Amino acid sequence: VLIMPGIGYTVDRPLLYWAAQALAADGWFVDRLDLKLTEDVEFPEMIACMERVVDQWRAEALEHAAESGEEARLLVVTKSLSTLSYPHSAKLGLRVVLLTPVLNPPPFDKHKSIIPAPLPGAVGSPMPLICAGDADPYFDDAKAHLLTDHVRTFAGANHSIEVPDDWRTSLDYLKQVTQAIVD
């Protein structure tokens, strides 16, 4: 599994950290793309970089599987900015988790980058799992349902799938997201 970060949301933040822990406990080999991204990143350049990372990771995982005689288990877990690499992963036929996908453009991205919905050329690729909060300004439930039937929306949750001033609900959501990824 390849774990990919978002802007200000590194792989050691709760959603990605616990996804990695749960998947490792479930027998997955976990690779993490450890980037420190800020709002001044050039979205098209970063998306292209992430697509190259996916290509390299996929090639290495397939090579390892062939050498070991094991079946390749390929899954990409993305968060926020890295969800914009989904169209590329879908074309490769990869299973993908989209945590807080960018379906509405962030105001700081002059390129207005979003995941197109519906996604052209995704026929035949596995439907992604989408998890997001309904208080996330970059999430759009209708667009999400154009991409997949596997949409988990969390009431009152923000772009981190957390509910401000409600740690109990935030932890419950974290558990639900982690479980959905493992399932």
How does the language model describe each region?
Residues 1-71, 163:
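Serine-hydrolase catalytic machinery in alpha/beta-hydrolase-like enzymes
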Residues 7, 35, 97-106, 133-135:
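Active-site nucleophile loop of the alpha/beta-hydrolase fold
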Residues 54-127:
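Primarily recognizes the serine-hydrolase "nucleophile elbow" in alpha/beta-hydrolase
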Residues 107, 137-143:
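Conserved alpha/beta-hydrolase "acid-adjacent" motif
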Residues 124, 130-132, 136:
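Short beta-strand/loop motif that positions the catalytic acidic residue
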Residues 134-139, 159-160:
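Acidic catalytic loop of the alpha/beta-hydrolase fold
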Residues 157-173:
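Catalytic histidine-centered segment of alpha/beta-hydrolase-like enzymes
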